[in-house]
Every structure is written in C-alpha cells, then in structure tokens.
Amino acid sequence: MMGLWRNNNDINITWEGDNTVLIQQTARFITNGLQKKMKGKKIPFSTLSFLSKFEDHSGEKVNISESKDLRNLDLLVQMLEHRTNMLLQKSVGRLAEKIENKKGVFDAWNDTQVFYLQSMSRSYGELYIFNCFRSTIEKIVESPTKKVLIDILVLFGLSSIEKDLALFRENDYVSSEACDLVRNEILNLCTGLKDELISILDVISPPDEVLGAPLGSSNGFIFENYLNQVYNFKGCFERPNWWEILHHKKI
C-alpha cells in the first residue's frame, strides 16, 4: 500500500519543473472558490468545504487542556482549517489593499504572493494531505500498523501547527500553555515512533539525498559513503590559502 502511495505522489510533486506554478494555481483555485461562496453559489469541491467557516475568527478559541487532546484528529483538522481561513482572510485583505492603491490586478496578485497567498496555499496543501491520509487510514482494519500510521498522521499535523504557533497565538486562539503541550507531544510522538522508523523507511525508500541522514545510507556502506562525501568535496586534498599563517617560520 505504501508503495502505491509513493508512486502516486512522485508524479504530482512538480508541474512544468517549478513548484511555484502549483502554488499560484492553488491560490487562484481557493480564491475562486471563495468568490463563489460570497456570491451565494455552491462551493463546487469538497476540498474547499472549510470555506463554509470563512468568517471573522477574532473571538474563536480552541480548548487544549492536556496532551491527549492533541491526539484528537477532529481537533487537528479544526486547527488546520482555522489557519487556512485566517491566511485566506489576510491574503484577501492584502489583495484588496493593493488594488485600492491603484495597482493593476496582475501586479496586486504578484505583490500578495510572499507571506500571504504562498503561505495560504501551503496551509491548504497540508490540510488536504492530512485529510487524504486520514481517510485512507480509516479504511484499514485495526492493527499495530494502523496505530503507527495514526501516530505519523498526528505528528505531521502537530509539526505543521508548530511551525505557525505565532499565527495561532493571534487573538489567543490557542494559549501559551497549549503551545508547550504541542511541542511536548511532538517529542513524545518522535520517541514512540523511534523503534518503527527503520521499517517505515524501508517501505517508503526515500532517496538518500532526501532523507539526509549522514549515517543512514540505503546501501549499508556507512563509513565508505561518509568518506566518499569527504573525498569528493572540492579542495579536500588541496593546501588551504591560509596555510602560511599557521606554518612555522624560522627566525
């Protein structure tokens, strides 16, 4: 099953050699969906269902009192949807501001990419990945494998949330104590998954350069690979240009 997931993912990673194309297409897809909603039309795609909650979130708060609350998948979806809606609100506001300043729509759109539409698109992507992963896991019969996959899903969700805790802290959507709980739960999940990681990596088989583990090469030649990296580094066997500074000179 994991192999099928990987094969399906690999061909969708880039488009025309540039991920920014996908980011901009995603932003346009979401804003078009919002326009339909604001006109009272039906939102055509289920992946945009979070737009039904697009509103002023200034008074909204999430209740996280203990670490087990962070294992609640519905709560994680709620938080990821909140983040996407908040970033969408900021993006729409920024876009409207640029247009009011007599910038053309094209220039206003480009000026709203960094920190706004790009962040919103990535947030939507992570929400979409979370929901797809969850729906697939729910089809699996209860087993140790399912438990591990759920832990990975929760870890993914919390890691995504942790990157934007400053955003979640706006208007006290989450408390400072909840931020500590998020970080602690990430550490607990990493500890719990430690014994399963070798099996997981064997199944997914990411390329060594993607994994980035200095001692975790897939061919098993740990020290040979490490030395090859050193020996192949540019200038490895050349005398450094500052050698004379350290060279002992006769007086």
Language model region names:
Residues 1-251:
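Flavin-dependent oxidoreductase catalytic core characteristic
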